[in-house]
UniProtKB/Swiss-Prot annotation:
Subunit structure: Serine/threonine-protein phosphatase 4 (PP4) occurs in different assemblies of the catalytic and one or more regulatory subunits. Component of the PP4 complexes PPP4C-PPP4R2, PPP4C-PPP4R2-PPP4R3A and PPP4C-PPP4R2-PPP4R3B. The PPP4C-PPP4R2 complex appears to be a tetramer composed of 2 molecules of PPP4C and 2 molecules of PPP4R2. Interacts with DDX20/GEMIN3 and GEMIN4. Interacts with RPA2; this DNA damage-dependent interaction recruits PPP4C leading to RPA2 dephosphorylation.
Chain residue ranges for the region called Disordered: 141-417
The encoding gene: Ppp4r2
PANTHER family on file: PPP4R2-RELATED PROTEIN, SERINE_THREONINE-PROTEIN PHOSPHATASE 4 REGULATORY SUBUNIT 2
Any GO CC annotation of this UniProt entry: protein phosphatase 4 complex
Domain of life: Eukaryota
Protein name: Serine/threonine-protein phosphatase 4 regulatory subunit 2
Protein family per UniProt: Belongs to the PPP4R2 family.
Biological source species: Mus musculus
């Protein structure tokens, strides 16, 4: 379609006093019905669109009159004239191209394709005109447009609040250009709520000091990491400022948490130390108790040793007394024998006694000593072992008696001679 030719045909249609169908404009409506592309603005072809819609509704009624039977009880019956006025009123109220323009053009170019009755046709047209969203013409999408539309409302292109931009949610939905910037004096928390006024002054100073040094670096990083956002530098600046404010707030919160944790840990450690001091006994008391136990153990060991020594002292004299007596008696016997032999030798020298007599006397003395020693041993066993002092006395007594007996024995041979 030639846009210039189309615009000339629209101008001629408006200049005519009597409205008639134009083949060029009908061809335009067929093109829109097939492709959905509107190459001109709504204000330019709005008049012809309304004329064509009214004419199609009238022709449909003449060709297919209303049914003679009773209306459907489940559907509200609306007269043709009332429905026609309602549809035309909605279409004239549009300030932009409705997003159902393609389906409306299909109904205008070929009304009997899907409908046979006038009532159903009017309800189908009403359903497609009762919309609020609008679309931009195809020429406005490719080139810069001076008009923007939102829900059928047109805004001038030089408005400072809006710019020409197609949105994901729908074409032609405007987007605000100059968003209100967040002041650094009132930053937002992570929940979106403003912080308390106490920390505003300190955050202002820190943000002003670090803002100048970090602004260039943050902008370069944002531009490198997100190249799509470069189309809106103002938005990037606002986002970078928000990131800086949040980073400063998080740093402060981290410092406050660290100090709080340190203080809490110090208090907990002090409380634990006090509890351990109160619960655990002092080391001096432990040492005293240990020394007392050691002393008692040593005393018990000493008492046991003393008892053992006393038992040994009681046992040894009884056991050793017979042996000592035997040794002392043997030594005394040997001494007495020696003395007797010496005396006999002297007497024999003086008296001239024969050696046979001396031998007999020595044998008698030996037998007498042996009998005496046997009697002494029996006496010691019967008495049960007297102490060492008594044994000494007993030993000394037999020695004197033996000496007397020896003298008597020596005197006997002299008397015999």
């Amino acid at each position: 379609m030639d846009v210039e030719r189309l615009q000339e045909a629209l101008k001629d249609f408006e200049k005519r006093g009597k409205k008639e169908v134009c083949p060029v404009l009908d061809q335009f409506l067929c093109h829109v019905a097939k492709t959905g592309e509107t190459m001109i603005q709504w204000s330019q072809f709005k008049g012809y669109f309304i004329f064509k819609l009214e004419k199609v509704m009238d022709d449909f009624r003449t060709s297919a009159p209303e049914p003679r039977g009773p209306p459907n009880p489940n559907v509200e019956y609306i007269p043709f004239d009332e429905m026609k006025e309602r549809i035309l009123k909605i279409v004239t109220g549009f300030n932009g191209i409705p997003f159902t323009i393609q389906r409306l053009c299909e109904l205008l170019t070929d009304p009997r394709r899907n409908y046979t009755g006038t009532d159903k046709f009017l309800r189908g047209v009403e359903k497609n005109v009762m919309v609020v969203s609008c679309v931009c013409p195809s020429s406005e999408k490719n080139n810069s447009n001076s008009l923007n539309r939102m829900n059928g409302v047109m805004f001038p292109g030089n408005s400072p609040n809006y710019t020409d931009r197609s949105n994901i949610n729908g074409p032609g939905t405007p987007r605000p250009l100059n968003r209100p910037k967040l002041s650094l004096s009132a930053p937002l928390t992570t929940n979106g709520l403003p912080e308390s006024t106490d920390s505003k002054d300190s955050e202002l100073q820190l943000s002003e000091e670090k803002g100048h040094s970090d602004s260039s670096a943050s902008e370069s990083e944002v531009s490198l990491l997100s190249p799509v956002k470069n189309k809106h530098p103002d938005e990037d600046a606002v986002e970078s400022e928000e990131h800086e404010v949040k980073r400063l707030k998080f740093d402060k919160e981290g410092d406050v948490r660290e100090t709080a944790s340190q203080t809490v840990s110090g208090e907990v450690s002090s409380v634990r130390a006090e509890e351990t001091e109160t619960a655990a006994p002092p080391p001096d008391k432990d040492r005293e108790s240990r020394t007392r136990q050691h002393c008692t153990e040593e005393e018990e060991e000493e008492e046991e040793e003393e008892e053992e020594e006393e038992e040994e002292s009681f046992m040894t004299p009884r056991e050793m007394v017979p042996e000592r007596k035997n040794q002392e008696k043997e030594s005394d016997d040997a001494l007495t024998v020696n003395e007797e032999t010496s005396e006999e030798s002297h007497q024999m020298e003086g008296s001239g006694v024969s050696p046979a007599q001396t031998d007999s006397t020595s044998e008698r003395s030996d037998s007498a000593g042996a009998s005496r020693s046997g009697s002494d041993c029996l006496e010691t066993q019967e008495s049960g072992g007297p102490p060492s002092s008594k044994t000494g006395e007993s030993v000394s007594v037999p020695s004197s008696m033996e000496s007397e007996e020896a003298t008597e024995v020596t005197d006997d041979p002299m008397e015999q001679d």
